């Protein structure tokens, strides 16, 4: 069980926040069909909420058929159709760049899309994290530093260069790519986006920009749930961190928005609508 977390944000119903987070983990394949869930008491300690709130969240998931609870037995994940689907092959290769603030759910969206389509998923943290941590330590910095001038000016640009090289190599091989990273600076720069559009077009591919919207309190819940060491500074200074976050930000070019707030639609359903739109656009080219 992970270490205790700070209290969950209270502006949205707590049970709904927890249920949505668990549902996203099921759809993203992090929680597998038949997997045993921790007890209500363990989950309550993990989320720093009451057992009653956990039971409410589990009831919401049970009503959707995502969790099964039997008398005197542990709750288990119920997702029998969770196996990866056959690969979706659009006419033209597709590149889906997914951006969003920390805790917005962009990686979960990428995983859901990858499971639905069979397309490669290129996540910045997965591809670069261990190298970044080693580089930071060589500079005498904490491996979890993501705020220093050294990280922002020297290491972060190299992370994105590596990510985009991996994307380009897949395109050169005729493969689709799902690319996930914050992209906050990049998506604010129209020139940067146009350069990537040109690169994709020259390789016979179509680029789609996706921004994951999430309200501040739900982002806080997701960051806590992730419980990653690199988020420690954000969590310890959350209000200060949020002063630099514009939840209403949108890229200055045509793009699609996925709403991952509690009041938004189910992420998996939004992901499937996105796939339909991508394949439809590809056929029309």
Predicted regions and their residues:
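A short alpha-helical element within helix-turn-helix/winged-helix DNA-binding domains
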Residues: 36-47
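Conserved glycine(s) of the Walker
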Residues: 105
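Glycine-rich phosphate-binding loop used to anchor ATP phosphates in small-molecule kinases
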Residues: 151-203
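Conserved phosphate-donor/acceptor-positioning beta-strand/loop module used by diverse small-molecule
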Residues: 202-223
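Small-molecule kinase domains that catalyze NTP-dependent phosphoryl transfer to phosphate-bearing small molecules
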Residues: 218-270, 283-285
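Extreme N-terminal segment that seeds HTH/winged-HTH DNA-binding domains in transcriptional regulators
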Residues: 1-37
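HTH-adjacent hinge/linker in prokaryotic transcriptional regulators
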Residues: 2-3, 59-96
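Conserved substrate/cofactor phosphate-moiety recognition/catalytic segment
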Residues: 111, 115-158, 168
